[in-house]
Amino acid sequence: MVSKTLPEEVHVQTSNKIKTHYEHGLFTLSIYKQSHFGLRMYRQTLDPKYTTTIRADVADMSLRLDKLYHQMHNKAELDGYVEDRLASYKKGKDERSVRRFEATQKHPEYFYIALDLLHHMARLDDYGLKHQHDAYFRKLLRGYDFKALFSNKTMTEAWAAQLANQAYWLKQIGEGDYTDLFVETLKKTYPDRKDYLLSQQQFGNKLYGMTHVIIADSGYYQHNVKESDHPWIYTYFRDNIDDILAYAKEDIIAEIGLSFKLAGLYDEPALKKIEKRIYSSVDQDKEMVPSDTGSFSFSWGEHRNVLAIMLLNWQKPNGGPDIQQNPTMFEDLPQSLTAK
């Protein structure tokens, strides 16, 4: 049995410092980022103080699905939405934006079927809820060629982490298991022997795809994973840790550390290097991890910093919340939602 090694006291103090900093400004963030933070903190602590962020998330998912149902019956609005999404990537000159525009302009339905609809349905499913138009939405999912999507190398080069999420979400809601297909495509898209050909952005995209296989398999920090289910990922992280530390962003590095912790691999030399790196990345005066460009944007830094909080003072994964186990958290549901 693997025993958990207690984190260093300075790591705990730093984690708590970042956590307090973000909790003080939490409601200045978008609902999406509030819930991203609150849900992860709830799954680490089971503290009911995060109920407000979870209720806001439920309301937001309901509104987004209500709007999507309307758009699906109004072609002009749906086309306009897709055009706006594509335009936002077309304006970007960075490699990620260029790749996403070029890949997704050929598959525009990806925006509203996979990035939006599937995401919202899976989140509600997590909470033990469903939308009143659940049957209609499932029909839309069944009409989308997910097999082609998860076999597409160009889409993988643009959206690796998102595709990992989507493969596991479909499995979660009972609409097909494409997890093995996506993993095979990820391996074919990024063979290890060709790492030297990757740009820094594509190296990061590869790593994000790998970490999100682990994180999605855990139900997003709800339960542990088995190393034996993903041996190639853990072997890669161990063998390439020095390159990862040299070229990856803090978000990715922290997710790799959390991937080890989710598998109970607390004494990994690679994990010790990661913890040291993330701890040293924290600006103790600003109480957060800055971006790779030195930005201390509170909003843009939420993802990076909630990962640092968890990494430096890891508790354990906890399931939920859901309406069956935590009914008081889900009182006064939006009219369009019911228990599953």
What residue spans do the PLM features occupy?
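Eukaryote-skewed repeat-based solenoidal scaffolds used as protein-protein interaction platforms
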Residues: 95-251, 261-263, 272
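Terminal, non-catalytic domain-edge segments
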Residues: 2-70, 74, 78-83, 87, ...
